[in-house]
UniProtKB/Swiss-Prot annotation:
It comes from Saccharopolyspora erythraea (strain ATCC 11635 / DSM 40517 / JCM 4748 / NBRC 13426 / NCIMB 8594 / NRRL 2338). It catalyses: L-rhamnonate = 2-dehydro-3-deoxy-L-rhamnonate + H2O. It is an enzyme of class 4 (lyase). The keyword Magnesium applies. GO terms for molecular function: L-rhamnonate dehydratase activity; magnesium ion binding. This is L-rhamnonate dehydratase.
């Protein structure tokens, strides 16, 4: 069966661009970032424009009218790339030509792509192709990937309230780091004091982690890690900018051996992860399947990690990563992003954009046998097609 049409759509508000939230959402409340060196951009990530792109939805329609859906953070610029460039490699191809289509999209965009926005767009197309193939074959995507190796997924929560996450049955709670190097010793002490208070609340047998969102340097991250070890910090995540592979290697040497070093949410393709694994030596890599190149590339990234003895715990991405994680032995648990504004309730990550999105109960998540990724676009969400290529 052939593919008839590709459509790139945009939406404003909650969706794949989960930073595009209303004010007072915990996910945007004083988070350390590379921009925190500038005081005017310290209190909010939206202040420097983290939500300017918005959500991109890609629909791939087969000759029989079956539609596959993929999403990412790319908005209108990503829609232009899909409609004006990538669509030519998809339309007219067989629904089973997933690997060939990926290779053509990647190689055709090398001169302006390789990472970032272009890979986000490629990822959305790739995910839509997997969703389409699963629907046509009447199989969930995890069946296309070799089948599950476990009955359910164990989840940790990324949250502003690890204490609530513990009550809800999650493995652990990952907090955003609030203060970076520009805030000096006082900020470092504030980070540790927050960890101390949270450890006091949750007790000894619950994971606590810090997400540093690329905000630190090797020296600060080393000091933070050793100070946090007293309160049994499980891991330090994305301490450095993605391109500092040498710095990650040095940080791994300096960190306490009992603490995990994790990173990779803003890395792309097997080539970037090869550098990261060989030079940075992380314990866990965290590719985002909506950004890193889609399922097609995540398969290769995961194999690389397995050969390097690293775990793969994808960043966010809900069903699009769940269907992968459940098929891999080196992905022993998964992330669940608490998207309730106060992080006090379990709500679907991509709400209101997607319907039928499964959520964990008691910190555990079971995937249904629904074909494809098992989700539908919400007809009440207003989608716009800013470009076409007809």
């Amino acid at each position: 069966m052939k593919i008839r049409q590709v459509r790139a759509l945009t939406v404003t508000g909650g969706g794949a661009d989960y930073h595009d939230q209303a004010e007072d959402h915990w996910i945007d409340d004083h988070v350390a970032t590379p921009m925190a060196k500038y005081p005017e951009y310290r209190a909010s990530r939206q202040a420097f424009g983290i939500n300017v792109l918005g959500t991109l939805v890609v629909e791939v329609e087969a000759e029989d009218g079956t539609v596959g859906v993929g999403v990412t953070t790319a908005g209108e610029p990503g829609a232009y790339i899909v409609e004006k460039h990538l669509a030519r490699f998809v339309e007219g191809a067989s629904v089973t030509d997933v690997e060939k289509i990926w290779d053509q999209m990647f190689n055709a965009t090398l001169y302006y792509g390789r990472k970032g926005l272009v890979l986000n767009a490629i990822s959305a197309v790739d995910l839509a192709l997997y969703d389409l193939l699963g629907k046509i074959r009447q199989e969930p995507v995890y069946a296309l990937l070799g089948g599950p190796v476990r009955d359910e997924l164990q989840c940790y929560a990324t949250t502003g309230r690890p204490d609530v996450a513990k009550e809800l049955g999650f493995l652990g709670g990952k907090m955003t780091l609030q203060h970076g190097p520009a805030e000096g010793v006082e900020g470092l002490h504030a980070n540790i004091e927050r960890l101390r208070k949270m450890r006091e609340q949750v007790g000894p047998d619950f994971w606590l982690m810090f997400d540093c969102w690329m905000a630190l340097d090797v020296e600060y991250a080393t000091r933070l890690a050793h100070a946090a070890a007293e309160y049994d910090l499980k891991w330090l995540e994305e301490a450095l900018i993605p391109d500092d592979y040498w710095g990650y290697g040095e940080l791994r040497r300096r960190m306490p051996s009992t603490m995990l070093m994790t990173t990779g949410e803003h890395e792309h393709t097997r080539y970037g992860f090869r550098l990261l694994l060989e030079m940075g030596r992380p314990d866990i890599i965290q590719p985002d399947v909506n950004w890193c190149g889609g399922i097609t590339e995540l398969i290769k990234i995961s194999a690389l990690a397995d050969a390097h003895g690293a775990m793969v715990v994808p960043h966010g991405s809900s069903v699009y990563s769940y269907h992968f994680v459940i098929t891999r032995h080196n992905s022993p648990f998964t992330e669940f992003l608490m998207m309730h504004p106060q992080a006090t309730e379990v709500v679907p990550m991509f709400s209101p954009l997607l319907l039928d999105e499964p959520v964990p109960v008691g910190g555990r998540l079971r995937l249904p046998e629904t074909p494809g990724f098992g989700v539908r676009l919400n007809p009440e969400v207003e989608l716009r097609r800013p470009y076409d290529h007809d």
